[in-house]
Every structure is written in C-alpha cells, then in structure tokens.
A protein has these predicted regions:
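Conserved catalytic alpha/beta cores of large enzymes that bind or transform nucleotide phosphates
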Residues: 265-273, 280-393, 397, 401, ...
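Terminal amphipathic helices with adjacent charged low-complexity linkers/tails
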Residues: 63-102, 141, 329, 417-448, ...
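Internal maturation/activation junctions in enzymes
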Residues: 231, 489-511, 537-619
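Core nucleic-acid recognition elements
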Residues: 1-165, 181-187
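Catalytic alpha/beta core of large soluble enzyme barrels
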Residues: 119-122, 132-142, 436-440, 496, ...
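Alpha-helix capping and helix-loop boundary segments enriched in small/acidic/polar residues
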Residues: 4, 155-158, 177-181, 200-208, ...
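Function-dense linear segments that define catalytic or interfacial modules
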Residues: 149, 155, 162-179, 183, ...
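A glycine-rich phosphate-binding loop feature that marks nucleotide/adenosyl-phosphate handling sites
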Residues: 49-52, 67-73, 189, 203-207, ...
Length: 738
C-alpha cells in the first residue's frame, strides 16, 4: 500500500465530507487495506468508488459525490502521468498540451492557433478543479465516457474542466473585442453547471470534422428526384449524429396518379421504409443508429397505414419499426373528434391538381375560422375530388392505440403553431423535429436540372428552408437559486449565435436557412429539481404560477440579449415584416409592462439577432451530466439505476433529503392535467415549443388519454412528445439534449 498516495486521496474526502457521513466508508476502506496490503492507489480508488456506489440510497444520497471524487482522482492521476507532471500541475500545462493535441489531429488546429501561447497560458490558469465537486458520479462518468477528447487508442487526453474551456474557446474564437473575457464568462457558465450546450457541441467543439447543431427538419417534395434527394440529405446529416424531422405531407398517397396514369402511386409508406433503412444503416460510425421522425397530415389518405407503421403485428412489409411518427393536427380535426363527426381524407396531389391549391399550405388564422377550414370544406363539397370518410374519433382511437403500444405518434397542433409563428411573413411551419420542440419555417428543396458542363455533371436545385436547431439549456435548480439568470442568458445567446457562424453543415440549404433566420433554441432543465428545492408540489397552483413568472423572465432576458446582440452584429436577414419588427409578437402575448414596452421599442428600432429564440428540449443526457432532472419532466423514481450497454449505476433524485423527498412524486402517479396547466403557463412565453411527455399507467382508459389530448389542444399546446406508458421503454434523441 502506498500510504502517501492514499493519504492524499483520503485527505480530500475528509475535507469534503463529515466523519459521520463516511463512517461506513472508512470501515470498508480499512477492510480493503487489510486484504490488499500492497494495493496501489489506482486499485484503491477504483474499489472504493464501487463501494461508495453500493452505499448510495435514499438515506445516503451524498455517496454519489464520494464516488465521483474518487473517480475524478483516478482521471487526474492518469492524465498527469500522460503529461509527465504532478497532479496539482495537470491544468497548468494545458496550453502546451492543447498545441500537442492539435498537432496530433485531436484538436482542431484552427481553434488552437487562433489564440497566442500567452492567451492559452492565461486561459489555463482559469481551470478550477474544485468545480468537479458539482458532478455526481453518473454525471462525471457520462461526460468522460462520451464527450471528453480521447486519442486514437481511446485513452483520455482531456479532463472535464478542459472540455468546458475548449467549448468556450471554440465558440468565441472569432470574437473581435474582449475575446478572452467572453471565453472566461462562458467557462464560468459551463463549469458551474449553470447551463449546458447541445450534445453535438459538447462532443465536437474544438475537435476536427464535427458539426455543432442538434436537429434538422426537411420538407420532402412530391417528386421521385425530391424524395431521393431528401433521403440523401438525411443520410449526410445522420452520419454526424443529427436527429432529423421529415415532413412527408406533400407526397401523393397510395393509388394517386403519376403523369396521368391512375392508381400508379404506392403512397408514402415505401418511402418511409427507405428512411427507416437509412436510419439503421447510417449509424454514426457504428456508435448508434440514426434517429428520424416522419410527420404526416391527419387528412392524408395514407394516414391509417402511417399510424400502423410501428405496430408489432400485421404485414411486416408495411412496418417501419425504427422510425418515429408524428401527426399534424388542425383545430378542425380536434373539433370533429370532440363532436364525434366525420373526417375526410384526401390525396394532396389530387387536391393540388383539381382544386388549384395545397391544403397543407394554409391554416386557420383565427380560432374557429380561417383559410384551412374554408378550403377543407371546399374539398369535401367537390364531388370530382376522391375522398375517404371515417369518424374522426376512430382515427383518434388508432392514434391512442399506437401511443400506448409504441409511445408515438407525436402531436403537432399546426394551427396554433402557425398563428404564433413570428416569421409567418416568410413561410409556413408544416411539422416539428425529432423531439417536437423546434418550430421554424419550412419548404421543400426542388430539383431543377442536371447538365454536363466542361465534362462535369452539374445538378441544380432550388433551395428550400431546411431547418437547423442550435440548442442550449439553463440548469434551473442552480441558475435560478443562485440568481444568475441576468448574467447567464446573454452568454448563452451569444454562444448560440456563434454556433451559426462556426458550423460546417454538410447540406447547403441547411446552411442557407440557418443564416436567413439565425434560429436558436434556448431551453431549460431541472424543473422538478427546482420545485423540490422551493418546496412546491407538482400538482399545485404555486407550480403553475412559478412556471408563468419564471418563463416570462427567461423570455424577457432572452429577447433582450438577442436585441442587444443585434445592435452589435445586425438583425437576422428576414427581420423586416416579422412579428418582431411590427411589434405584434409582444401584443399577442400581452406584454404591456413598462420594461416590455421599452424592449418592444428597442426591437422595433434596432432589430433582433435571431428569428427564433426559445425551445425546451428533452435534454436527458445533459441533465444527467448536470446532476438534475430532465427538461420540464417529473422524475420516474426517487432511486433508480441508470443502465447503459456496459454498466448499471445507482442514482437518486437530485439533492434528495428529508425536506425535498416529499416533493419528488413519480411521473406515473402525477395527475397529468397539472402538467398540462404548467406547460400552458410556460408555452405562451416560448416562441417555439416544448418536449411535453405524458406519463400514464398501462391500465389507462381511452377516454382518460383522450381527455389529456383534448385539454392539451384547448390549452394551446403546440405539440406533445411521447405518451410514456409503464409498459413501454422509449428512447430520447441524444442530439436534442442540451
């Protein structure tokens, strides 16, 4: 046994925890030393971190930090040995180490060489090992296993605090003034776990060949070339780890005509199966298969086959088990469901041909009336237009059957989405992304021609709006309680705007759309954690009121930050004519206080940097890193095991103690109507949407689930995500974690 080395490790524990807390731990440590008298430090650290995890339970939740401290000691010892320095000097040499890693192709050379050696040395001095004490064991292990830089032998060459600094350095390398201070501010925000960036940024910032955006949405054109071009674009994004939403509502239905030949089309299902194959085969260098959500309108003739795509029975030739599905629902359909009236299904190609318009290209501008229901009724009344008739409630039953068996389809409430779209002057929003929180203008990229010029094949396509999501989230339980929102949010908005400039997207129309709208998605996580710390029950008016007040504050600070950034960098190119410019964004939401009027005036006069600003993603994996609860979701259990393919780690609810335990009620026992009320309160302050899950028992009756959907629609939810039943396991999009 190396007494000196163990003394250092033990001394750190004694400084961080009381003797009473570690009484059982020291007893187990003594037993280990007796059994391994020649045991080395690394073996002791490994063995005792496992013992600490075994001691973790609801009465002793602090053992996750004991295990994290021991694991962190192992990491520092390993990296210090590699760098040939003492553990206490491991961060001091990071500036020189960064140059070596860039020379080896492990860091992006353009990032490192954009800073002088003097600047690298200064930034290295900011690295604060004590902030590792904020990590739970599962949080630290997740960060190390999945995100810190490793060499070509998969050995760790970067420590957690250095990952935070590299993200800050990467995202601010093109800043023209006060660059180091902006890097330092971003490092402060990240290392204190006040915020996280999206997982692609977390994983790829500062590394070669990595893209930084989270999710994408494509609109498929109704042509053979358009369908295959879209599939190729999806594949090119999927290989970099992006989660993708695909809107198929413009593609003609089964039995539609092709070039005048009747009953020639095979409909959307075969093309969705092609996307399913893409998701499975383009598997991100073997790490995990791609993630694609396909959306279809509820009036599309193929909707019933679409709803059966993920079912476990029936004709396998009509199944796509690896695709996630979403339905686009107008107000009129929900009204027909509630009234138990008939619903009509149409072929979008036939509607375009006979009616001279596309039904999907319009919506109800006002509740209860508008262009969509007028045109829908015209289609119903046109006897020349073929149509299928089915009770609306029967379609809803099919939806709910699929949801209870598979968790999907997601719901996209298209009328409310487009009524609240701040950029309706430039287009339509047809669907959402993989996690239902991103809602931005969309349009199909159209093939124009292929020619040979100078013995080179040249293909021309007219670019559509191919949506890109750039995400970051606030850790509510830390940032709100520490009172740092006013300092934090401008840092986040600047970082997100910088991602737009730095990102190297493989799809040109996506790059174009990103620059036209400069859309970002600032969100939150740790909501249940915050409620528990504030001693507020989930099922209470106090929780609803807090959601309203807090998200109005976050919205104000986010809009203010983007408006201030516009004064420095200019507005997004499509600002003129937007709700932002005209001031209707503020009046629609009843923002009439003095500070809101002043902000409205500022935006109208000097603009806003980002056309879309807020979105609440699922962010389950980054919430694990930050040691808090995911998104706006309640916890599953107070104690559970986080299972990955190669390990199983016990976890307790964050900051679980005799005071907070009473406020951690399991998701499956919470009245979901209170969840809807909370989200109605926050949704009015969020210009995009929220990944809103329903948690239900597998014994739920159809009428109860229907009541949830109807209330969500009536409360002006823009979307709902999974229906999570106790009988099914579901997978979140890692890319949307932020």
């Amino acid at each position: 046994m190396t007494t000196h080395t163990l003394f250092r490790s033990e001394e750190r524990l004694k400084q961080l925890f009381t003797a009473e807390q570690l009484d059982e731990f020291w007893r187990l440590s003594k037993r280990w030393k007796i059994r391994h008298p020649q045991g080395a430090e690394d073996a002791w650290l490994h063995a005792m971190s496992l013992e600490a995890l075994n001691l973790l339970d609801e009465q002793h939740p602090y053992y996750t930090f004991v295990a994290a401290t021991l694991y962190e000691e192992q990491l520092y010892t390993q990296v210090a040995t590699k760098r040939n320095v003492a553990v206490e000097d491991v961060h001091t040499v990071f500036g020189k180490e960064a140059n070596r890693l860039a020379a080896r192709g492990l860091y992006q050379a353009e990032v490192i060489t954009s800073y002088s050696q003097q600047e690298l040395t200064e930034m290295s001095s900011w690295l604060d090992r004590s902030r590792n004490q904020l990590f739970t064991y599962i949080g630290l292990k997740t960060l190390v296993d999945r995100y810190v830089t490793r060499d070509f032998n998969r050995e760790i060459v970067e420590l957690p605090q250095e990952r935070w600094l590299m993200i800050a350095m990467t995202l601010h390398r093109q800043e023209k003034t006060n660059r180091l201070q902006k890097v330092k501010d971003a490092y402060w925000a990240l290392s204190n776990l006040y915020m996280t960036v999206a997982t692609p940024t977390l994983a790829n910032a500062g590394k070669p060949n990595g893209q930084l955006s989270s999710c994408f949405i494509d609109t498929v054109d109704d042509s053979l070339q358009g369908i295959y071009d879209s599939n190729t674009d999806v594949a090119n994004l999927s290989k970099y780890g992006g989660g993708i939403g695909v809107y198929m509502g413009k593609v003609r239905s089964r039995g539609s005509s092709i070039r005048g030949f009747k009953n020639a089309s095979s409909g959307v299902v075969p093309w969705i199966k092609q996307l399913n194959n893409t998701a499975v085969s383009v598997d991100q260098l073997g790490q995990r298969q791609g993630a694609i959500a396909v959306y279809l309108d509820i009036w599309h003739k193929d909707i019933l086959a679409f709803l059966d795509l993920r079912l476990n029975n029936g004709d396998e030739r009509l199944r796509a088990h690896d695709i996630f599905t979403g339905v686009c629902l107008p107000d009129l359909f929900m009204e027909k469901v509630e009234a138990r009236e008939e619903w009509y299904l149409f072929d979008p190609h036939e509607v375009r041909t006979l009616m001279g318009f596309s039904l999907e290209d319009c919506y109800d501008e006002q509740e209860g009336r508008g262009t969509f229901r007028t045109r829908y009724q015209q289609c119903v009344e046109n006897e020349a237009l073929s149509k299928d008739t089915i009770p609306a409630i029967d379609i809803m039953k099919r939806i709910m059957k699929s949801q209870l068996e598979t968790g999907v389809p997601f719901h996209f409430y298209r009328d409310e989405v487009n009524r609240q779209n701040p950029n309706a002057h430039e287009g339509m929003i047809y669907s959402s992304n993989l996690c239902t929180e991103i809602m931005q203008n969309m349009s199909a990229t159209k093939f124009e021609s292929t020619t040979i010029e100078d013995d080179i094949i040249v293909t021309k396509r007219h670019p559509g709006d191919f949506v890109v999501c750039n995400l970051s989230s606030i850790h509510l339980a830390r940032a709100v309680e520490d009172g740092v929102l006013e300092r934090l949010i401008p840092i986040q908005v600047r970082m997100l705007d910088n991602v737009i400039e730095l990102n190297d997207l493989p799809i040109p129309q996506a790059k174009r759309t990103n620059l036209r709208y400069r859309g970002i998605g600032l969100g939150t996580f740790g909501w249940h954690h915050l409620l528990a710390k504030k001693a507020i029950r989930w099922e209470s008016k106090e929780a609803v009121e807090l959601a309203d007040e807090l998200y109005e504050e976050i919205a104000f600070l986010t809009i203010q930050a983007s408006a201030d950034l516009a004064q420095e960098r200019g507005s997004y190119p499509l600002f003129t004519g937007s709700d932002w410019e005209q001031g209707t964004y503020f009046t629609k939401r009843g923002y009439t206080s003095g500070r809101w009027r002043q902000l409205k005036k500022q935006v109208g006069e000097t603009g806003i940097r980002n056309g879309y600003l807020m979105a609440v993603a699922p962010n389950s994996s980054t919430a694990i890193i930050a040691g808090t609860t995911a998104s706006i979701d309640p916890i599953f259990q107070k104690r559970y095991s986080e299972e990955k393919k190669d390990y199983k780690i016990p976890v307790t609810a964050p900051e679980l103690n005799e005071e907070t335990t009473w406020y951690y009620k399991s998701a499956y026992y919470i009245d979901q109507h209170w969840t809807i009320r909370q989200n109605a309160a926050r949704q009015k302050h969020i210009d995009q949407s929220i990944s809103l899950n329903f948690y239900v028992q597998n014994t739920i009756q159809a009428k109860e689930l229907l009541a949830l959907h109807l209330e969500a629609w009536k409360q002006k939810m823009k979307s709902t995500y999974y229906v999570r039943s106790t009988s099914i396991e579901l997978i979140d999009c890692d890319s949307c974690s932020s």
